[in-house]
């Protein structure tokens, strides 16, 4: 399950 890391430049790829 992908959780978006808000505040990053690429919210589509910056996931945990």
Curated annotation (Swiss-Prot):
Subcellular location, record wording: Cytoplasm
Cofactor or coenzyme needed: Mn(2+)
Binding site for Mn(2+) 1: 8, 12
UniProt entry tagged with the keyword ATP-binding: no
Top-level taxonomic group: Bacteria
Disulfide bonds: none
Molecular function terms, GO-annotated: inorganic diphosphate phosphatase activity; metal ion binding
Keywords: Cytoplasm, Hydrolase, Manganese, Metal-binding
Residues binding Mn(2+) 2: 14
Enzyme Commission designation: 3.6.1.1
GO CC annotation terms, alphabetical: cytoplasm
Keyword Metal-binding: yes
Reaction it catalyzes: diphosphate + H2O = 2 phosphate + H(+)
Co-factor note (free text): Binds 2 manganese ions per subunit.
EC class (word): hydrolase
Family: Belongs to the PPase class C family.
Protein name according to UniProt: Manganese-dependent inorganic pyrophosphatase
């Amino acid at each position: 399950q992908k959780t978006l890391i808000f505040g990053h430049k690429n919210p589509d790829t910056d996931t945990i």
